[in-house]
């Protein structure tokens, strides 16, 4: 959902992420790298999941609420108000559902995340539970793996904000120079 209005930036990000994965030792002979948006089945699965989640449940997700605030989305921003971004994009708002399809499609049993992502995985578990109740025991309910080491916890952004994030443009990339 980041840079949806800038396809060239999306293409560049894909290349940069792939290079980052390779630079930290991910071996393409042992791991499959793919572009999520090129796997239509992930979108289809998310579409089914959307019928299992209410708008109210998405609104209560602490991660979604925090990201809305960080990105400056305003639900009722007045037309022409340049101090806030206009509305919350549906793709952004339903990201927890998309993330659930990413996790469940590949039958992930454990998902390593930071503490801030715990509500997203909990929502995935809720979706799995509802799906399995309707369609039978089909999906794997993933476990959350949180870091034990405090040094692995959330890093502050380069701008001093609480969270380092590529979408907030306040992070350090593996490809950055020492400066």
Give, region by region, the residue ranges found by the protein language model:
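Active-site cores that bind ATP or allylic diphosphates and position pyrophosphate for catalysis
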Residues: 65-179
